[in-house]
């Protein structure tokens, strides 16, 4: 007998829901059944973010730093890229603050990738489409073409390793706790960043110390993003195939809480076993090397 020669088996959201209902001893019949299954599946994905690192959700981000002058530099950046589409960006200056004429919202310019776009820091306030923007140091003006989306930034779960690149050479940065960053006496010191603080708000940010001393250094880091939502039933899940059994088992357990309480115990046990097996496989196969670090040691 010949083998199939294919290795592309997958389940769309509708098939995942059908399998989960069948494990509960039920059948998916109505539109509400499909809707409640998708809702439970999205809650399951949120729970996975709380269980630890899912390697397929790790993304590499490269961000250029921004400095306006020897006394003004951007130290806090979005974890990802916020792009502002405008009528013209040429006359604005990297590092300066822009203000919305109607909303009074503010943000700092990080880069100007094209003649009609700027990347900015997390806005303070909400910019309004078509309003006039004014630069604080250049006095340049332009019009905001469309509303700004923060969805990519808000999908960040956490940040992993961070480095700063200068002249092709990378240096690893050390992470500060909220208390350690607060204890820094002079947060306005400029230099090559050596440390960073991640503020895990709904719109998370990363703050560097010392503040960047130029607009050419690059910050390179890995961020952990959210698993994409289970929206349309024809979509497939944002997971590797190894997690298909785990996803189905987890959804079956979540549905049993609502529809088949007599099966909660056994379905929960199956789910926990499937998740542990998948999570154990979802790791990096590297040699263990322990290196002591004294960069953040403080003697009191």
What are these model-derived regions, one by one?
Residues 1-81, 143-300:
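Glycine-enriched, solvent-exposed interface loops adjoining structured elements
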């Amino acid at each position: 007998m010949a083998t199939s020669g294919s290795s592309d088996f997958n389940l769309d959201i509708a098939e995942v829901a059908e399998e989960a209902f069948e494990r509960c001893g039920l059948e998916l019949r109505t539109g509400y059944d499909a809707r409640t299954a998708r809702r439970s599946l999205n809650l399951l994905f949120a729970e996975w973010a709380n269980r630890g690192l899912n390697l397929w959700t790790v993304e590499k981000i490269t961000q250029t730093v921004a400095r306006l002058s020897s006394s003004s530099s951007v130290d806090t950046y979005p974890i990802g890229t916020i792009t502002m589409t405008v009528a013209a960006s040429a006359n604005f200056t990297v590092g300066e603050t822009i203000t919305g004429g109607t909303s009074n919202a503010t943000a700092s310019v990080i880069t100007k990738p094209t003649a009609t776009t700027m990347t900015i820091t997390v806005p303070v306030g909400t910019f309004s489409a078509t309003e006039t923007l004014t630069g604080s140091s250049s006095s340049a003006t332009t019009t905001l073409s469309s509303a700004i989306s923060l969805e990519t930034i808000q999908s960040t779960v956490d940040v992993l390793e961070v480095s700063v690149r200068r002249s092709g050479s990378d240096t690893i940065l050390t992470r500060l706790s909220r208390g350690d960053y607060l204890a820094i006496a002079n947060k306005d010191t400029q230099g090559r960043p050596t440390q960073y603080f991640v503020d895990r708000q709904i719109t998370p940010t990363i703050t560097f110390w010392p503040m960047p001393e130029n607009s050419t250094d690059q910050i390179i880091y890995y961020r952990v993003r959210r698993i994409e939502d289970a929206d349309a039933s024809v979509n497939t899940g944002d997971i590797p195939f190894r997690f298909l059994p785990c996803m189905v088992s987890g959804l079956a357990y979540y549905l049993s809480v609502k529809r088949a309480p007599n099966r909660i115990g056994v379905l929960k046990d199956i789910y926990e076993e499937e998740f542990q097996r998948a999570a154990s496989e979802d790791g990096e196969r590297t040699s263990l090397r322990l290196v002591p670090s004294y960069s953040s040691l403080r003697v009191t």
